[in-house]
Amino acid sequence: MSEPVAMTLLEDWCRGMGMDIHRSLLVTGIPEYCSHAEIEETLNGVLLPLGTYRVLNKIFLRQENVKAALVEVSEGVNLSSIPREFPGRGGVWRVVCRDPTQDDDFLKNLNEFLDGEGRTWEDMVRLLKLNPNPPLPNSNQPPPNWAEALGLLLGAVVQVIFYMDAAIRSRDEEARAEEAAEAELMEAWASTARKRVKKEPGLGVEVGSAFKMEDRNYWKNTEDHGDPPKPLVRRPGGKIRSRRRKQKKNLKQEPICWRKSQGSNYNSNYNKVNLEAGEAAQSSEIPESVKSNKKPFVKQEETVWKKKRVWRDPSDLPRSALPAADSPGNLEDSDQDGGPENPAKKKAMTWASNKIPVPTRKKKKMVSLGTLSYVLLDAEATKNKTAILKKGLGARRAVSVPHDAPASTSRPQKTKLGAFPRVSKDSRKL
């Protein structure tokens, strides 16, 4: 093995085991079969007279097929006095170590370099970080890491500020949540109170007093929850006025339907005719504003078989018409031929035409009046007024049928004593 390779191996081995190179030796040329005791026995004759020593480790070199041993000597042993070669078992053993003169030359060159750069050995040790435990600084001198200390202090202050800010924000959020919940409760309570006041008007005083007790500035802070409810205050006499207005609004004139009495008295029918005449007079006095709201009454022409008939009390007729009403045969003749009863017939028709017809329910009633009988008059006077024909089959039939029917179509009605005259089916449809 060459000397530079052996020196490199010694430096690497000392650095790996943490040994001082100035006290270490590398012994090469030891045979492979040589034991540890035999190595120490051979070294005792060379190193023991110079001082104590210790064999630290051994290694096998494959290229040379020999062993190498790392030996540490005690302090005070001069390495220059150790021989570089000595005889041993299996051949010549060689010794490799650091020459002290080499170190002196290196140190001389290093000092010259540091002086030229303006550096010292302490600067080199600090830069190379060769001393893991630096000496404590003097208390009188300021600390060299004052910037780091200031940064730590500022970091602690910033953390405290952030913590306080977070606490203040959490408190504000809790207060806002409580205010929002209170506002929602008040709004719900106000809505329920309004509903109860609408149902029970007597509760307006309690609600008004409750709203008076509330703070006026309270609703200004709840802009996000909509408009505040208006205070409900009950005024004296408000309930009476509301009822009066309600009565005025609901006041409607409903038509009174007069129903025919089902009795058999003659006076009841007579009173009914008078009441109808009174209603016609009242309806004639209705103002135009009311008439405008009602639908116009339209008269329709009817056929001969469905003419309008008017029942008339015989007492209201003139005396000239009474003898003609004794029998139904005379009645039919007077209606068809237009005999001497035409003036009375015209009078009755004009009285019926002056009446404003009131929509009444037509019923078939049989009233027994003893020997008296009603006179069925034809209301032909109403045909003189303008009539509006309806479109349809009924209107066409009404136009096609002539107004004057032949006398053969009418049949004399048979009457029984003490009973009503028999009325044809066409006359009952009234």
UniProtKB/Swiss-Prot annotation:
It holds the Pfam family PNMA_N. Residues 232-250 have a biased composition (Basic residues). Residues 219-270, 313-364, 392-430 are annotated as: Disordered. Residues 219-228 have a biased composition (Basic and acidic residues). Residues 261-270 have a biased composition (Polar residues). Signal peptide: none annotated. Belongs to the PNMA family. This is Paraneoplastic antigen-like protein 8A. The gene is Pnma8a.
